[in-house]
């Protein structure tokens, strides 16, 4: 087994028995693949049925109303973005690129005859069609400078669905849902009548739709019912028994007798195949029936007197005596009737036709028009156009390929081609037929929560739909422009206005429900947000009306959606996460991978199955035991089939799970011993990992699952080598790799990776990358070169390993509180850096422009000490609450001055009183260090000193970076040429003869530019040198071009909002240590609040004097049933013990042979998966041992983790008791505790619920306008509400003075509170109470009722 660069430094011991069959697919592919399909910019000529291309093809050509112009689509191009991703974030711009569409305007001769078109001219050009946001490499969008994610939506798939309303007997319904267009419903009522609805409007008879399609009443009956022939004469009535086989299974309503009056089949019996044979053998072809039965029948076809052409009866008329008499009169002795006798099937349509008052197609169309457009007078043309536009015109109605596939599959017919996306007559007839079958018990209703009936709409598809909406508006505009613009040489640009497209796309990305501000607490929260699947949003469910069934876990979720990870609260079950191995197929259905089983042997062939396909197969679990030939060991195997768990013979198994973790999401797969935790707690654990704050120093989990490196790799926060090579240069800002051209298919000799330093994330956490490679290290493509935030050697590291004791300590563990050791604070274990962005905007006001200046009235020198001459804070300044960050003055209205004031103004040249200080200050309760300042201003007034200084610094840095980059390229080219040419024969060189041997010494005397002029006799060598020469020249040109582009983007003017003159952004880094009140959690849903930070000497300690780091309450485990944390603590202790063992060996010797023995015992004595230590050389073994001193990292995959015996064995090797318990001593008294305590290492996280962000106090502040009471909440700088129940409490104590204070001066007594503030300032401790404002509000409300209420002061005066 080969190890990557990072793995060699720290190998994770892996438990788990199951073989590794399939790598976890790229976690962000659901985002990147979808948008790639939409844009397909890199495969311009191969664009077929995807995204932009198909929308443009469907929308064009556009024809003018008079037919003179036609605008055709030819091709499109996506340009280059103006700024790169980083630049867009800094400037608050959108990362997008212009879309240019090539359009062809065909002009026809207007004098030509009506039916002939003579082309007069063709004009073609590229037309700008708005900007399309581009996706970053990590699957996000940058919109107005902020990173956003478009969440995929799970919605009802287009197609037909049959359901039953349980509130009413027989209330079955069918709904045809298109991808785009009107919904069509058919439903039964309790009487058996079939009704139709269009777009959930007023219902009408279903037969109206059939008539509107052109069917006559006779054809409708023929399609939906059987007919039988009745003969009649003087003896009575007889029913002909033709098509006997069709009557099988039906209930007979009469006796069948033979010629001798023997009963063959009795009345009220279901007809069987044997009965049919008996009837045929007896030669019975008809059976006598009485008139009572005949009178319940209806005519199947129109009855016409052939002699006169007169209609005696219409189809569906009741059979009556008078009708029979009329038939006898014209000599008709047999009658074709609808078969209600042997089957009830025809009655539904027949009864519906009785309710239907329309008689033909025209009347049916008018009826539909009245339903959809009530109040509009129906004109013949508009009536037909409306109906056709509903379901039969592709621009307005589309089932899409998914809808057509689902409709054909559900109706079990392929009559309609899969390329037809509108409804056909046969579709509607088929749906009604299937609905009748379901009502008759011959079909099943659909399960709407089955993942075969729900599909995923990803980002590309949503943007495509939005683009279509915009293009539809553009299309309307083009038609209008064609008829309005009168120009001799009309060009496509003149008639196309792209603003509707830009507006539609901008609206989607800025305010769409599924375009969300990216959750960026840590790399996991980013990955999870991009893999989220929401049932909410436009066209989806609403959380208020979603019932339990929709939210529940469904059998088809297995391997597709995670059954664990979903939010707590109103969105539970509506927002899900994609399972680790799941993918979305071309139709938008979720698929899960399985191993194919052939003749009882499990192969390594992988097949992805959708939920629909999976229903038909028997699938074994991943943990099913196999022998060495991959055959099943046991005869009876637990499997899944059709959504049920079953035991079945091994010969029946068709597929097998790929991995034990395939049913859970990436976040849940990070929880070790997940299988030992209660599901509710795992849900909390998975969600809380996303809230973990990245700490100053990242530390890998000692007990992991092996998923850590996959999440870290795919999150995009680490830097990954593009090509194999050698590390040439490393510093904190960049890594330079000299590429190994033999291993890598690239012409580049050098790869340069720039690192992100101290960048603010969406959640104000700090993004910082650190190199983990050293100069001279050999790396392969795909190796981790630098860690991102919350990663450690390429593994996700959200928290720290702490020594935990499960024991109470003086009540400080009450209600899940956590007791922490002061060592954790001293070692900065949970210290995190948060970067806050403060923005100051100078606007142009009515009274004049606001100004950012250091000259501010009535502000002391000390307050301005941290500002530069432009009035902006210096980088590196330590700022406290209330400090000025950006000094700004705002003009205020001029007041009338007395002559004396004017004179004083003139003498002292004072202009200060007509401006107000509106500076940006540091908010209360915060302090930190200024790490960056950005200034954006309009170029009209010229740039300020600070802006020019920042610009110069950025240009100098860019120049330095590019010079260094070129220097590296030059040195690499130089060394590669030197290796090849020293000792070669010269063809031509200044200072040497032809045929001379080139030496190192001669090369050293020449500048590098002269090296490139030397030519050689050896042709192959000459070719190599020529390639290096060309690469060098191209690199020089490319770097100069890159620098010029960078310089242009730095100096480019900023587009500020209207009325804004200048924007200053100040970034302040705030260091937050852990303190009481902060929330912490483990990975098993075991959360709590830090109650006290205890000095190290008071903490309980072990026999060797080692103090524990954390005390947790043991009562938090039994009722929560998350036993995984105990197992994690035990295994963590074993891991720590193994680390100590390696450390002791290192102290004794640094010989690789001895170390290998220890490592062999540590890694390979327990568990099935062995570590190949032979793959590491002696130096790598030493490095590995140095990195393992703190503990040997262990991977215990979910559902395939370490067993109890494994943990005990490891504890034994690590030198601990196998029960994981030990004697602890009280740090205060030195006495041992009464019982042994469970102690172990647990991975704990600090969550983004910090007490600093919640702590808040107020004396005076803002008040509500109406009630004049203080506002609420920290954001409004509000007060604490003293509510009704609190008032009762004070009343109960009789604290009258406190109560008066609370209800008046501290609340809404305006005059009283002003007076009180003045008294406090003056040092007087008296309180005057006035009328509270709430009384005035009440008085005004009573006045609204016409009652005047006022205080009566007369009694006091008397």
From Swiss-Prot:
Keywords: DNA-directed RNA polymerase, Nucleotidyltransferase, Transcription, Transferase. InterPro entries: DNA-dir_RNA_pol_bsu_ext_1_sf (IPR042107), DNA-dir_RNA_pol_bsu_external_1 (IPR019462), DNA-dir_RNA_pol_su2 (IPR015712), DNA-dir_RNAP_su2_dom (IPR007120), DNA-dir_RNAP_su2_hyb_sf (IPR037033), RNA_pol_bsu_bac (IPR010243), RNA_pol_bsu_CS (IPR007121), RNA_pol_bsu_protrusion (IPR007644). GO terms for molecular function: DNA binding; DNA-directed RNA polymerase activity; ribonucleoside binding. CDD domains: RNA_pol_B_RPB2. Its EC number is 2.7.7.6. It holds the Pfam family RNA_pol_Rpb2_45. GO terms for cellular component: DNA-directed RNA polymerase complex. It catalyses: RNA(n) + a ribonucleoside 5'-triphosphate = RNA(n+1) + diphosphate. One of its GO terms (biological process) is DNA-templated transcription. PROSITE patterns: RNA_POL_BETA. Disulfide bonds: none annotated. PANTHER family: DNA-DIRECTED RNA POLYMERASE I SUBUNIT 2 (PTHR20856). DNA-dependent RNA polymerase catalyzes the transcription of DNA into RNA using the four ribonucleoside triphosphates as substrates. The RNAP catalytic core consists of 2 alpha, 1 beta, 1 beta' and 1 omega subunit. When a sigma factor is associated with the core the holoenzyme is formed, which can initiate transcription. Belongs to the RNA polymerase beta chain family. This is DNA-directed RNA polymerase subunit beta. The lineage of its organism: Bacteria, Pseudomonadati, Pseudomonadota, Gammaproteobacteria, Thiotrichales.
């Amino acid at each position: 087994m080969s190890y990557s660069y990072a793995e060699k430094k720290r190998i994770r011991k892996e438990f788990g028995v199951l073989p590794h069959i399939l790598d976890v697919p790229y976690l962000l592919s659901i985002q990147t693949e979808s948008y790639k399909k939409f844009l397909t910019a890199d495969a311009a000529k191969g664009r077929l049925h995807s995204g932009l291309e198909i929308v443009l093809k469907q929308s064009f050509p556009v024809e003018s109303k008079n037919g003179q112009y036609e605008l055709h689509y030819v091709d499109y191009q996506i340009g280059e973005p103006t700024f790169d991703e980083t630049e867009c974030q800094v400037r608050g711009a959108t990362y997008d690129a212009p879309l240019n569409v090539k359009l062809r305007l065909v002009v026809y001769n207007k004098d030509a005859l009506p039916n002939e078109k003579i082309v007069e001219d063709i004009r073609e050009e590229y037309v700008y069609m708005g900007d399309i946001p581009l996706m970053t490499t990590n699957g996000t969008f940058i919109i107005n400078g902020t990173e956003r994610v478009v969440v995929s939506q799970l919605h009802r798939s287009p197609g037909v669905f049959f359901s039953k309303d349980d509130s009413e007997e027989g209330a079955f319904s069918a709904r045809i849902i298109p991808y785009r267009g009107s919904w069509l419903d058919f439903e039964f009522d309790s009487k058996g009548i079939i009704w139709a609805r269009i777009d959930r409007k007023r219902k009408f008879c279903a037969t109206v739709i059939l008539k509107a399609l052109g069917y006559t009443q006779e054809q409708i009956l023929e399609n939906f019912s059987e007919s039988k022939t009745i003969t009649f004469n003087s003896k009575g009535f007889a029913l002909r028994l033709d098509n006997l086989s069709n009557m099988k299974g039906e209930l007979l309503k009469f006796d069948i007798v033979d010629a001798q009056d023997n009963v063959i089949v009795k009345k009220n019996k279901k007809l069987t195949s044997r009965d049919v044979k008996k009837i045929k053998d007896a030669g019975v072809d008809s059976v006598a029936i009485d008139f009572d039965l005949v009178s319940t029948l209806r005519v199947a076809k129109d009855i016409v007197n052939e002699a006169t052409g007169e209609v005696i009866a219409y189809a569906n008329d009741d059979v009556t005596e008078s009708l029979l008499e009329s038939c006898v009169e014209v000599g008709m002795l047999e009658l074709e009737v609808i078969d209600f006798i042997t089957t009830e099937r025809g009655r539904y349509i027949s009864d519906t036709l009785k309710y239907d008052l329309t008689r033909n197609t025209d009347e049916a169309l008018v009826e539909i028009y009245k339903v959809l457009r009530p109040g509009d007078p129906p004109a013949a043309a508009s009536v037909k156009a409306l109906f056709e536009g509903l379901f039969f015109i592709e621009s307005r109605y589309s089932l899409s390929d998914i809808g057509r596939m689902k409709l054909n599959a559900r109706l079990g017919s392929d009559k309609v081609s899969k390329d037809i996306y509108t409804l056909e007559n046969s579709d509607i007839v088929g749906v009604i037929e299937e609905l009748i079958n379901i009502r008759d018990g011959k079909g099943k209703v659909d399960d709407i929560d089955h993942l075969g009936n729900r599909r995923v709409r990803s980002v590309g598809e949503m943007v495509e739909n939005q683009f279509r909406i915009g293009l539809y508006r553009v299309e309307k505009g083009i038609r209008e422009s064609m008829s309005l613009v009168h120009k001799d040489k009309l060009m496509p640009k003149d008639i196309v206005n792209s603003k509707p497209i830009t507006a539609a796309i901008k609206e989607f990305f800025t305010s769409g429900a599924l375009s969300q501000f990216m959750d960026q607490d840590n790399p996991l929260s980013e990955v999870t947000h991009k893999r989220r699947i929401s049932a909410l949003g436009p066209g989806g469910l609403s959380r208020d009306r979603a019932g339990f069934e929709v939210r529940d876990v469904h059998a088809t979720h297995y391997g597709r959606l995670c059954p664990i990870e979903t939010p707590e609260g109103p969105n539970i079950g509506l927002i899900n996460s994609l399972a680790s191995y799941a993918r979305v197929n071309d139709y938008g259905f979720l698929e899960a991978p399985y191993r194919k089983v052939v003749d009882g042997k499990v192969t390594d062939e992988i097949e992805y199955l959708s939920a629909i396909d999976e229903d038909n197969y028997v699938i074994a679990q991943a943990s099913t035991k196999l022998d060495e030939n991959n055959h099943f060991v046991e005869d009876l195997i637990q499997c899944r089939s059709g959504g049920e768990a079953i035991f079945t013979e091994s010969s029946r198994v068709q597929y097998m799970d790929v991995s034990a973790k395939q049913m859970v999401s990436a976040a849940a797969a990070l929880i070790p011993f997940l299988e030992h935790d209660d599901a509710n707690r795992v849900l909390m654990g998975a969600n809380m990992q996303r809230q973990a704050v990245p700490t100053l120093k990242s530390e890998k989990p000692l007990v992991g699952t092996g998923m850590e490196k996959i999440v870290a790799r795919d999150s995009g926060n680490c830097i990954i080598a593009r090509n194999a090579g050698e590390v040439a240069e490393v510093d904190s800002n960049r890594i330079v790799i000299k590429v190994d051209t033999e291993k890598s298919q690239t012409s580049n000799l050098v790869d340069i990776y720039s690192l992100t330093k101290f960048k603010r994330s969406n959640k104000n956490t700090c993004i910082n990358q650190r190199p983990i490679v050293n100069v001279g290290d050999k790396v392969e493509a795909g190796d981790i070169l630098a860690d991102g935030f919350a990663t450690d050697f390429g593994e996700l590291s959200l928290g720290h390993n702490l020594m935990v004791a499960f024991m109470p300590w003086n009540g400080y563990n009450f209600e899940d509180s956590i007791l922490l050791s002061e060592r954790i604070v001293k070692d900065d274990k949970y210290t995190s850096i948060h970067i806050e962005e403060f923005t100051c905007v100078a606007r142009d006001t009515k009274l004049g422009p606001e100004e950012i200046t250091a000259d501010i009235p009535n502000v002391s020198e000390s307050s301005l000490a941290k500002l530069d001459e432009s009035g902006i804070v210096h980088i590196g300044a330590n700022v406290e609450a209330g400090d000025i960050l950006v000094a700004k003055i705002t003009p205020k209205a001029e007041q009338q001055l007395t002559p004396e004031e004017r004179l004083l103004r003139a003498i002292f040249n004072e202009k200060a009183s007509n401006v107000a200080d509106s500076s940006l200050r540091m908010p209360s309760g915060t302090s930190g260090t200024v790490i960056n300042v950005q200034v954006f201003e309009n170029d009209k007034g010229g740039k300020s000193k600070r802006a020019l200084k920042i610009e110069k610094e950025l240009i100098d840095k860019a120049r330095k970076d590019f010079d260094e980059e070129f220097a590296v390229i030059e040195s690499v080219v130089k060394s590669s040429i030197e290796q090849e040419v020293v000792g070669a024969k010269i063809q031509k060189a200044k200072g040497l003869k032809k045929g001379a041997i080139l030496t190192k010494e001669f090369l050293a005397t020449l500048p590098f530019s002269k090296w490139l002029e030397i030519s050689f006799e050896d042709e192959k060598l000459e070719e190599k040198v020529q390639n290096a020469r060309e690469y060098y020249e191209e690199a020089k040109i490319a770097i100069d071009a890159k620098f010029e582009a960078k310089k242009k983007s730095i100096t480019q003017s900023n587009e500020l909002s209207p009325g804004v003159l200048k924007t200053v952004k100040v970034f302040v880094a705030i260091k937050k240590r852990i303190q009481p009140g902060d929330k912490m959690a483990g990975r098993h849903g075991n959360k709590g609040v830090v109650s006290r930070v205890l000095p190290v000497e008071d903490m309980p300690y072990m026999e060797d004097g080692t103090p524990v780091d954390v005390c947790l309450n043991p009562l938090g485990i039994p009722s929560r049933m998350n036993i995984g944390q105990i197992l994690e603590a035990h295994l963590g202790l074993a891991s720590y013990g193994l680390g100590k063992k390696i450390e002791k060996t290192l102290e004794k010797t640094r010989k690789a042979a001895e170390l290998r023995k220890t490592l062999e015992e540590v890694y390979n004595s327990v568990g099935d998966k062995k570590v190949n230590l032979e793959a590491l050389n002696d130096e790598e073994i030493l490095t590995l041992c140095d990195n393992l001193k703190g503990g040997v990292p262990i991977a215990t995959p979910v559902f395939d983790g370490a067993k109890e015996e494994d943990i005990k064995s490891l504890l034994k090797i690590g030198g601990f008791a196998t029960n994981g318990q030990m004697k602890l001593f009280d740090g205060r008294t030195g006495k041992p505790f009464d019982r042994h305590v469970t102690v172990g290492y647990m991975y704990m996280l600090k969550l983004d619920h910090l007490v600093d962000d919640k702590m808040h106090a107020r004396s005076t502040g803002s008040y509500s306008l109406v009630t004049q009471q203080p506002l609420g909440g920290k954001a409004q700088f509000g007060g604490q509400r003293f509510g009704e129940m609190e008032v009762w409490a004070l009343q109960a104590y009789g604290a009258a003075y406190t109560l008066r204070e609370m209800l008046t001066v501290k609340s809404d007594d305006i005059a009283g509170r002003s007076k009180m503030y003045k008294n406090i300032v003056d040092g007087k401790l008296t309180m005057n109470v006035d009328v509270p404002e709430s009384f005035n509000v009440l008085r005004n409300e009573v006045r609204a009722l016409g009652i005047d209420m006022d205080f009566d002061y007369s009694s006091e005066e008397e």
